[in-house]
């Protein structure tokens, strides 16, 4: 499950725990103080967040050998996408909850899998 270059789930979990602890070490700034003090705290917090993001990318790239950029997924043309309105939208009080279902013809990317 974990990865591309034979890395184990345990390696992935270690990396995730490390990245999580980095983000938890930088809580959002407090809202007290003058406007200038709050602005300075937010500025310093954003800079620390950028540093943590760079460290996280380095961990994923170096330790796990992964790129941070997602793999491009080939999507079908928009003309082939339809919304299924035959399903009930829910009972009163829950209308609009959830996501609409999208029906898609199987693109060539998905057809390369196991045949039945």
Curated annotation (Swiss-Prot):
Short sequence motif named Nuclear export signal and binding to XPO1, residue ranges: 73-84
Keyword Phosphoprotein: yes
Region (Homomultimerization) residue spans: 18-26
Assigned keywords, A-Z: AIDS, Host cytoplasm, Host nucleus, Host-virus interaction, Methylation, mRNA transport, Phosphoprotein, RNA-binding, Transport
GO molecular function, one term: RNA binding
Tree of life domain: Viruses
Compartment(s) where it occurs, according to its Swiss-Prot or TrEMBL record: Host nucleus, Host nucleolus; Host cytoplasm
Keyword Membrane: no
Gene Ontology cellular-component terms listed: host cell cytoplasm; host cell nucleolus
Stretches the record annotates as Disordered: 20-46, 84-116
Post-translational modification note: Asymmetrically arginine dimethylated at one site by host PRMT6. Methylation impairs the RNA-binding activity and export of viral RNA from the nucleus to the cytoplasm.
Record remark: domains: The RNA-binding motif binds to the RRE, a 240 bp stem-and-loop structure present in incompletely spliced viral pre-mRNAs. This region also contains the NLS which mediates nuclear localization via KPNB1 binding and, when the N-terminal sequence is present, nucleolar targeting. These overlapping functions prevent Rev bound to RRE from undesirable return to the nucleus. When Rev binds the RRE, the NLS becomes masked while the NES remains accessible. The leucine-rich NES mediates binding to human XPO1.
Quaternary assembly: Homomultimer; when bound to the RRE. Multimeric assembly is essential for activity and may involve XPO1. Binds to human KPNB1, XPO1, TNPO1, RANBP5 and IPO7. Interacts with the viral Integrase. Interacts with human KHDRBS1. Interacts with human NAP1; this interaction decreases Rev multimerization and stimulates its activity. Interacts with human DEAD-box helicases DDX3 and DDX24; these interactions may serve for viral RNA export to the cytoplasm and packaging, respectively.
HAMAP family per the UniProt record, alphabetical: REV_HIV1
Name listed for the protein in its UniProt record: Protein Rev
Gene (name only): rev
């Amino acid at each position: 499950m974990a990865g591309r270059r034979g890395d184990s789930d345990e390696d992935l979990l270690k990396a995730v725990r490390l990245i999580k602890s980095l983000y938890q070490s930088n809580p959002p700034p407090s809202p007290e103080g003058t406007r200038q003090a709050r602005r300075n705290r937010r500025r310093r917090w954003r800079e620390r967040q950028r540093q943590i993001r760079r460290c996280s990318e380095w961990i994923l790239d170096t330790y796990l050998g992964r790129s941070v950029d997602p793999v491009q997924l080939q999507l079908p043309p928009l003309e082939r996408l339809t919304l299924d309105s035959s399903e009930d939208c829910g009972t009163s009080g829950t209308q609009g909850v959830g996501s609409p279902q999208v029906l898609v013809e199987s693109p060539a990317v998905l057809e390369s899998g196991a045949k039945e």
